[in-house]
Structures are given as C-alpha cells and as structure tokens.
Amino acid sequence: MKILITGIGGTIGSVIADALSTRHEITGIDIRPVNRAGVSVADLTDIDAISPFFEGVDAVVHLAAERRHTPDIGWDLLLPTNVIATANVYDAAHAAGVRRFVFASSMHVAGNYESDDPWASIAAGRYDGLDPDSVPLVTADMPARPDGRYAATKQLGESLGRYYSDCEGMEVICVRLGTVADSDSIGDDPRGYVSWFSHRDLAEFFAACVEKPGIRFEIVYGASANKWKIYDTPSSWKVLGFTPSDNAEHHRG
C-alpha cells in the first residue's frame, strides 16, 4: 500500500512513518525539509502545488496542523493550516481516488467534558472515591464540546471527513488523539495519566487505522491502555481490532 503522511517531519509523523515503512511504501509532505526518502516540501494551503503528490496513493494520514491550543491563539494562525490546508488535503485525496483517509483530530474536541465531574477530578489527579472501572466514559457519539479555537478547527476537520465519506465515498477515520510527547514520557500534568499515548501504541494504532478493512466513517479516541480514562478508548480499540501494550500507570512515580 502507498501511504502519504502530511506533517511527516514531526514526532507523531516520524513514529508512524517508521512503523509503517516496514510493510508499506511511505511518502510525505512537510512544510520544511525532512531527512527521509519520498518526502516533498510543500505548502498545504496551495492545492495546485500539492495535488500531484496524491496520485497513486492508497491512504492518506493527515497530521499537519497548527498544534498550539492556548486560549489566546488567533484565527490568523489556525485557519490557514487547520482549515484551508485540511480542506485541500481532503479535496486532493478525493480527486486522486484515495480510498482511506485518516485525520488527526484531538481529544480537545470533547475537552469541555473535563469541566464536569467525575472527569474534572480525574483530569486533575483527584481519584478519592472513584473506581476507574465504574467511571462513565465520553463516547464518540456524544455532542462535541470543543475547549478552544484549536479544538473547534479540529471539529471542522471531522465534519469534512463525514462529508467526504457520506457524499464522496471515501473511507474516513478521525482520530481524537491523546498526548504524544517527544520524549515518550508523561510529564508532570496529572491529565497525562489519562491521555498518554505511547509511541509504540501510537504506531500500531495508526497502522490499524490504515489497514482495517470495512470502515466507512469512524471517530475514534487514541490513547494507551491507561488505568484512568475519560474518553471511550476501549470501544475504539474494538472497532480497529487494536490491542494497546502500554499503561501510563506503570510510569507513575
């Protein structure tokens, strides 16, 4: 299978490309030069420039984004990369006959559920009186509750995926990603024990997103098999036939 990865030069792109390259042909697009064969430098907001790279591609993994999600980030930074570029990538993929499209969304699309208990307590690391096996989970079919402008742009990317699936016949999986650290560590934020996605699990999860047959449209949550959960990752694992290997709890000091 020939797979095109946008944003291939980042941590997530590199981890996924390294894993998939053992069994697929990998190409990529990045805004900056990347020391990897098959990678082209291009601006995703220029659809005429990027369209030729999609010819003959079987699956697209769209990772490229403005990833800052601070409350004060402006639309001037978010709209070109997270909206215009994303629409261009969907459109170029469809025009080239790409079968499978995997869109990197974010847990932040549902992030305002973390303002409510019991999820607020779990995100803050306050576990007293809570049973991890009894906490209700935020599912993919619950209404989106974006926690900022960044999250709102990711929600739009999911809506584009639904359109291209329902109206254009493309197979689309939107991955509401947890936390992927450059160092593969959890860090000091207690929310990391909910959202941590190990590099090993990340790679195999995206492999399943690309390879699992019979999917028309799905929104899935991506994280490791962490003890404390807010989002319904187990249902996503079942949809993809994926078994995670890691658990953030094993790294708790």
Where are each of the predicted segments found?
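Conserved Rossmann-fold NAD(P)-dependent oxidoreductase catalytic core, especially the SDR/UDP-sugar
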Residues: N88-A144
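Conserved C-terminal active-site "lid" loop/helix of NAD(P)H-dependent oxidoreductases
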Residues: E218-T243
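Rossmann-fold cofactor-recognition segment
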Residues: I31-D46
